[in-house]
Structure formats: structure tokens, C-alpha cells
């Protein structure tokens, strides 16, 4: 099926109104895109934070009268009469196949591979985690996830308990279990993440060793030999007292989701309780690790 799209620029305040209107007049999907390469950090849970200068892209069936769409936008008064816009025909492709072709097995450290379920594992004797891209964050493609996976691969997890704080897809907890951990515990504020982690654990045959909790239901006396938290700098600092108590004495801590420019302030929150290692950087992101005193 062929498609046509309209792209127009908007402020963050109007973008959602324009999106709603485009859907009302027949758009099959609407996408927000950054028009000025502006980073967005640390939205609140449930918040959709947009760029100050946002491109709104509405996708329509190719038979749609786009002149009528433009006229409807003007009549809605959500845009000026002479608003700048671009209309493009979209090539008809097997989008699912193209999407699948973009994901390949990835190696982290010496032993660990993350593989999409539709790909053949490169090394059957390696530690293979089968994980498909989904709604919850974490497939190994982001530098922060890669940093955490490499760190877990470097540890001897045999017989240990691991907490994945902010578990998302469950990728870190599942990797830890496959790397030898006796038990893993995933904690997240998002029910979608709990569901995704459970499904991914089932697919990897480790569901019987993974416990999952919404953050509000986290047991009070919970502790582990290893705690990994791949969230963001703000929550890592705000939740430091909680995260610190999760780590057993002499236990290992790994933190990421941190921009390199934020490393110093995050280290300050944990340094009193941990002997911290040198910060490891990947692209603009970094990882902080240490052993509890």
C-alpha cells in the first residue's frame, strides 16, 4: 500500500493539538521529530516532552486529497494561512522486513550476545540472549545498555543475586541470569516494563529465576550482590539512598543512563558509600561502577 505524508513545523505547545487534528481528518499515524537536534533529558513518568521546535509528520493513504488536508489545517486555525509544509510520496515497501533487517546479533564483552529471535545465533556456545525490539526500553543498541552489558559480562556472577533497577525490557536481568547469576530481580515504575521483562524472561527460559516488582511494591529489606541501574542522572541522584541500600556490603554497583558531563555529580552521590572505579565513556554516555564499602 502506498502512502503520502505532510510535514510541518510547530512549537511544542501546539504539536499535540495538530497531531490530534490530523488524526481526526484521516491520518493513519502522526510522528513528532526534532527539527533542530535539541536533546531532551529526563521526562517525568508518563510525560510526553517535545522539542521547542518540533516537526509534525502526518501519514495518509496515497489516495488522500492533500490539498483538502492543507485547507482543513488552515481552517482549524492551528496554523497560519501561509504555513510552510512539505508533502511527499512514500515508497511502498515491505516495512516489516526492512525493520527486521536493521537488527543484527550484537556481542558485548567476551561471552555475551544479544540476538533477535529471527536471526541465527553466531556462536551457539556463547551466552545468547534472544531479545526482539519492543515497547520497553533496552535492546542493546543504545550506548548505555551496551556499557551495562559489557560490565555484567566482565563480572563473575556465579551463584549471585542481581537487581536490575529500572529493568525496562529486562535485558540486563536476563543477561545476568544467563551469565550465571542464581537469581535476578527487576524493578520498574512502568507496568509495561514488568510485562515485557516477564515475556522476555519466558522466551529465554529464565522466568523461574526472575522476580519482578513495580517500584511501589519493592520489598523493604531487598538486597543483592550486584545492582545495575540504567536509568538517568536525575533519578540516579534522587534515588541514591534507595539504590545504595539495595547493595550488600562488598557488593558491586553499576550505573548508566548518564551523560559524560553528568558523571561528576552522580559520583558525588555514591562516593561516600562506594569505592568507585574510573568512569568509562562510550560516545557521549558513561558508566559508573564501584564496590560498596
Curated annotation (Swiss-Prot):
Keyword annotations of the record: Cytoplasm, Methyltransferase, S-adenosyl-L-methionine, Transferase
Domain of life of the source: Bacteria
Lyase among keywords: no
Cited InterPro entries: Ribosomal_L11_MeTrfase_PrmA, Ribosomal_PrmA_MeTrfase, SAM-dependent_MTases_sf
GO BP: methylation
Chief location category: cytoplasm
UniProt GO molecular function: protein-lysine N-methyltransferase activity
Subcellular location, record wording: Cytoplasm
Catalysed conversion reaction: L-lysyl-[protein] + 3 S-adenosyl-L-methionine = N(6),N(6),N(6)-trimethyl-L-lysyl-[protein] + 3 S-adenosyl-L-homocysteine + 3 H(+)
Annotated binding of S-adenosyl-L-methionine, by residue: 145, 166, 188, 230
Gene3D superfamilies hit by this protein: Vaccinia Virus protein VP39
Enzyme kind, highest EC tier: transferase
GO CC terms in record: cytosol
SUPFAM superfamilies: S-adenosyl-L-methionine-dependent methyltransferases
Function of the molecule: Methylates ribosomal protein L11.
Name the record gives this protein: Ribosomal protein L11 methyltransferase
Amino acid at each position: 500500500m502506498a502512502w503520502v505524508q505532510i510535514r510541518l513545523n510547530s512549537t511544542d505547545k501546539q504539536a499535540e493539538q495538530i497531531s490530534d487534528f490530523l488524526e481526526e481528518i484521516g491520518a493513519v499515524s502522526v510522528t513528532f521529530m526534532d527539527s533542530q537536534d535539541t536533546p531532551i533529558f529526563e521526562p517525568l513518568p508518563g510525560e510526553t516532552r517535545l522539542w521547542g521546535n518540533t516537526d509534525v509528520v502526518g501519514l495518509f493513504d496515497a489516495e488522500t486529497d492533500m490539498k483538502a488536508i492543507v485547507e482543513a489545517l488552515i481552517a482549524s486555525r492551528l496554523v497560519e494561512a501561509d504555513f510552510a509544509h512539505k508533502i511527499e510520496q512514500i515508497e511502498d515497501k515491505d516495512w516489516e522486513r526492512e525493520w527486521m533487517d536493521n537488527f543484527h546479533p550484537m556481542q558485548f564483552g567476551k561471552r555475551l550476545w544479544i540476538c533477535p529471535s529471527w536471526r541465527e545465533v553466531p556462536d551457539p556456545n556463547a551466552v545468547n540472549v534472544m531479545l526482539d525490539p519492543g515497547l520497553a526500553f533496552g535492546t542493546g543498541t543504545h550506548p548505555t545498555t551496551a556499557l551495562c552489558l559489557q560490565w555484567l559480562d566482565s563480572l563473575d556472577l556465579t551463584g549471585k543475586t542481581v537487581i536490575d533497577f529500572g529493568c525496562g525490557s529486562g535485558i540486563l536481568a536476563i543477561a545476568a541470569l544467563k551469565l550465571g547469576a542464581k537469581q535476578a530481580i527487576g524493578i520498574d515504575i512502568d507496568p509495561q516494563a514488568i510485562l515485557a521483562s516477564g515475556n522476555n524472561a519466558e522466551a529465554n527460559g529464565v522466568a523461574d529465576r526472575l522476580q519482578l516488582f513495580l517500584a511501589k511494591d519493592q520489598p523493604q529489606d531487598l538486597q543483592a550482590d550486584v545492582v545495575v541501574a540504567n536509568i538517568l542522572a536525575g533519578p540516579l541522584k534522587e534515588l541514591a539512598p534507595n539504590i545504595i541500600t539495595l547493595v550488600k556490603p562488598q557488593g558491586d554497583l553499576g550505573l548508566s543512563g548518564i551523560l559524560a558531563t553528568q558523571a561528576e555529580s552522580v559520583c558525588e552521590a555514591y562516593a561516600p558509600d562506594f569505592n568507585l572505579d574510573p568512569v568509562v565513556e562510550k560516545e557521549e554516555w558513561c558508566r559508573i561502577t564501584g564496590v560498596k564499602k
